[in-house]
Amino acid sequence: MDWYLKVLKNYVGFRGRARRKEYWMFILVNIIFTFVLGLLDKMLGWQRAGGEGILTTIYGILVFLPWWAVQFRRLHDTDRSAWWALLFLIPFIGWLIIIVFNCQAGTPGENRFGPDPKLEP
């Protein structure tokens, strides 16, 4: 949960680097929250037919900016520009490439986007 909160606190931090653990823990908690909120939407009758419910929509809006920020920092950790995020516009293949990038280890030591986040206290 600490990793999730770290991302939320740095919700406009598009500079710097994000470790794999920071990124994937944020994604995992998002999946869990979205699932739970989806169940609540369904139980409360707040889910539109074939669409998102009220709670999941509000949650999605709230984490939209922090998700982009951590995605940019994750790309920076692999010494890639945030422009690589444009691959999200290419269905399936672009998404797969981004997943591969997000699974790769960050560059050891300092890179052009900042110091190694593993070495920071």
From Swiss-Prot:
- Here the disulfide bonds are none
- Residue ranges in the Cytoplasmic topological domain are 45-49, 102-121
Q: Which GO terms describe its cellular component?
A: plasma membrane
Q: Extract the Pfam families matched here.
A: DUF805
**Periplasmic face of the membrane:** 1-23, 71-80
Principal subcellular localization:
membrane
Q: Which InterPro entries match?
A: DUF805 (IPR008523)
Compartment(s): Cell inner membrane
Q: What is this protein called?
A: Inner membrane protein YhaH
